[in-house]
């Protein structure tokens, strides 16, 4: 945990573990987590990396005996909502309960990034639905057209011929 967290308040000077083994173990756990965190999104990875750096900096061993009680320290700070933080064991740090992942796109958007109004979005949706319906209603005629299209038939014949040739070649070599 950095010393300028939580709205610029001074964080307590946390006790660092004197034994180098404990230091190694705690940072090793985080490293391991980071290594296997392929499924995490970028911001989670960044948080994990940040936690790892802080662990290596000042070994935040809040759960261990002898470390200052963070909640006690927090309760003495003016203007801090004490319920807004929770201890995240996997990161070994205190995080805000409100930190939810951001939604990547606004609910209504076009590819240009200009927001469409809900009415426009509804109209677009209806249009897509009607297109889908049209396709499903006329699917068989479409498929028949495709099946009887001379170009496609020629292509399929070529493909079949090519496959047969390949089969013959491999058979020849196997004998």
UniProtKB/Swiss-Prot annotation:
Residues 1-32, 156-175 are annotated as: Disordered. This is Uncharacterized protein MPN_143. The lineage of its organism: Bacteria, Bacillati, Mycoplasmatota, Mycoplasmoidales, Mycoplasmoidaceae. Residues 14-24 have a biased composition (Low complexity).
């Amino acid at each position: 945990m950095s010393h300028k967290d939580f709205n610029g308040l001074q964080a307590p000077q946390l006790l660092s573990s004197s034994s180098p083994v404990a230091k190694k173990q705690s940072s090793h756990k985080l490293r391991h987590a980071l290594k296997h965190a392929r499924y995490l999104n970028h911001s989670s990875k960044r948080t994990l990396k940040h936690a790892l750096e802080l662990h290596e900096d000042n070994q935040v061993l809040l759960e261990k005996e002898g470390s200052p009680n963070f909640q006690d320290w927090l309760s003495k700070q003016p203007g801090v909502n004490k319920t807004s933080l929770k201890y995240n064991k996997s990161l070994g740090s205190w995080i805000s309960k409100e930190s939810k992942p951001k939604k990547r796109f606004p609910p209504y958007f076009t590819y240009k990034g200009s927001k469409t109004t809900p009415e426009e979005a509804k109209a677009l949706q209806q249009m897509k639905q009607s297109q889908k319906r049209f396709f499903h209603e006329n699917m068989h005629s479409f498929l028949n057209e495709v099946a009887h299209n001379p170009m496609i038939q020629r292509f399929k014949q070529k493909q079949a011929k090519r496959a047969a040739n390949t089969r013959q070649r491999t058979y020849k070599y196997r004998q």
